[in-house]
């Protein structure tokens, strides 16, 4: 049997906007698409092969005279790395999901791995050149991303669908019932924590077009084109040809394919069999047709079978007596079948099990017969490993292929009866992927699927982040890679607080500004560089008075200066607050930068106050005003408008470092407030963050800033190796609660236990942060947790300016 039509697949513009008036050129283009769809006037046998009657815009498909179906697309969740309890919960919920469908609903699970959208993945990692001095770096970074993309299978777009079909007398009757089922399906997915959405008619047609055009090709279609052209939806999705005459193969366009079915022979199955088949890095389509048997009918059938087996047993016993041997000796198969039938009856009657009929189909497609046979052999090997057999559908290739498109129609009568829990073992969840487009940044490869991890922290409810890891685990490198990526593809400002002078090379290469704060006040070039902790701008707070928030900062600063267990007393705080308001009054009346107060002005104002506490606070400040640590008693003389600013505070020493970090944090807040007015994001990276959390007051201020950053367009990232110190702070829970992004690299044994409890990490996930190499770990993005690995190419200019390994820094 051979069905063939020779016409080119429709190609043209993407889905137009019907309300807009079409231009002459667009009308011409649409006319050409319709002309191509009409073909050469021969019988459209390829269209006739596709087994449905009509697709409606709302996503309902009329499959046969009385059968209607709808499709829901769903995403993956982390099943393989889940805690044992979570795995059990997912499995039980999936069993409940299957039990929801009664005998009147046919269910089809479809898993489509296709390489048709590799261009979209490459587009996501393409960094276009710009008119600046960084195109050589852009090219290098773009090439690195393309190489990483090639390592994974992001070119294989993995999609999951569930299609449910019912029989109804009319479209109206089908519509209301399908809507109820759709709502219940979405709610069931919600219970599983799975993101799902119903598909429109256009989306279902686009999906079918992708299946029938595995070599690619743009889908161009609009429902408004059907009436004037006299065409059906099939004309826009059918391939150039189908051939089914070879018995064991089919040909579709330029591709050759084969459909096989899974013979389930094993007494027990592993929950990885489906995921192993889907992990094959080849174009594969897997479909499970599941049909529930009416519970009463199933129980009656099994009881009849038990009765038949008992009759056979009695006959065997009579035969034994006549022959003169022990009547208890009966054929072993008979005893086994009887025992299994009774167990099955018990499952159905008392263990919340149902009976299902399952058809498991696997479609492989390739460019050549040899490649196809290799792909089929690989899939058959997985079946064999699980004591099953993958058997070719000889002379049923057409029915097999058409049963493998998500329409809800099963044309293959080969079915295996299974209980709910046996059916649920084909669990459709493996690992989540994180591949966003737009301004998404690269973080590494998914260690489970080898797919690229691209995500945009701005899409999170709370983009604040943490980078945690032991020395040598790749923390600083990961931060630098994120900075570079953000610098190249966004217009965000990037500010770094650098306590160890590790970022100079990268900042210099990106023409950023390094502000070196030291007790002498001398910068890298030997010229004075000062930052004024009293700096303020009129946008400093979202209310009318920016002074309240600034006063809070100065209280934190004074608390750090005074030190001691008790810190500032209520009277001290009152005195400081009064002095702050007095000092800023002239500047706020006339905001001239030359009138910006400095620490010395606060010192003098405190001396004017009558309370003895004021004199005590002033005495504590004296060291920082007129003493040897007076580096912060000057007006800011450095330009802070560069996109990339690094505050190098290594030379401040122990006495000034915490103070320096706090002052830098305040400078960043100033920048964030200015940028918000310009609708610009500010990324702030804080290395050795645990130092800020050691003092209660600086910790409280840091947490306050952490909370406030989000709605002001700030994206703070804390980097630390010292998790114990980080978690010793009472404020740290607020940091974790307000951070939807965590990059966790290798962890020490004690820290692992603490983090596992804090972030609810499973033992399987903890393996990825236990004795791992640099660049390996876990990424937490909202509710998504993925194991990642990043192997940045060492033979690049970027690697040389980003590495912090002493031997490599020397070479650079």
Give residue ranges: language-model regions.
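Conserved lysine of the Walker
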Residues: 475
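Extended, folded cores of ATP/NTP-driven motor/assembly subunits in large transport
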Residues: 1-429
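Post-Walker A helix-loop "phosphate-sensing" segment adjacent to the P-loop in P-loop NTPases
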Residues: 485-495
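Conserved AAA+ ATPase "SRH/arginine-finger" region at the nucleotide-binding site
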Residues: 516-521, 741-750
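P-loop NTPase motor domains
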Residues: 77, 84-103, 110, 114, ...
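Hydrophobic anchor at the beta1->P-loop junction of P-loop NTPases
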Residues: 467
